[in-house]
């Protein structure tokens, strides 16, 4: 039924001379958490094509970081804003669970989703930094030689809607004591340097990794990333 309604709306737009310029979604932050817990799949569907998402009626207890990561997981291009009941914009400084100024940023298994979204939103903060994390390797014959995608599987809406999230990684003179060849779907501990490059698909600057060291690792107890 939902798909039929969506098709009906598209048909009506196609019948006019109107051009869809921007899709804006507004969300009542005071009830958003309830919908995320009880109707996540339906709730997240409306964000997939949004250009801008505004959470209104926010207060000091609003979990802005969690809401932002949930939106970015299904639609990385969407801009996400937060407003108080009086219309004033909320400050969005989020306390990160790792030291972004450390010599090596150590991302724990449960914090991968936070790092992934923050690096996407603020690539300049991570420019030139070194990161260490446990990830799963994705390889494809279609990828350029010497490239992998290290990342994690994330549940963005429900168990039937899982997405592999990660950034491209170059293997240039990468060191390893435990691996002669990196296999597809293999779990590794990756130490890499982060840089930023323009991504044509997303029309924005995105992180790209250069591997320094890769070592064989056991899978984490919880292999999925949740938002």
Predicted regions and their residues:
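OB-fold and OB-like single-stranded nucleic-acid-recognition modules
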Residues: 10, 19-35, 42-44, 48-227
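A general "mature secreted/periplasmic domain" signal
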Residues: 14-16
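Short, small-residue-biased leader/transition segments that mark boundaries at the very start
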Residues: 2-9
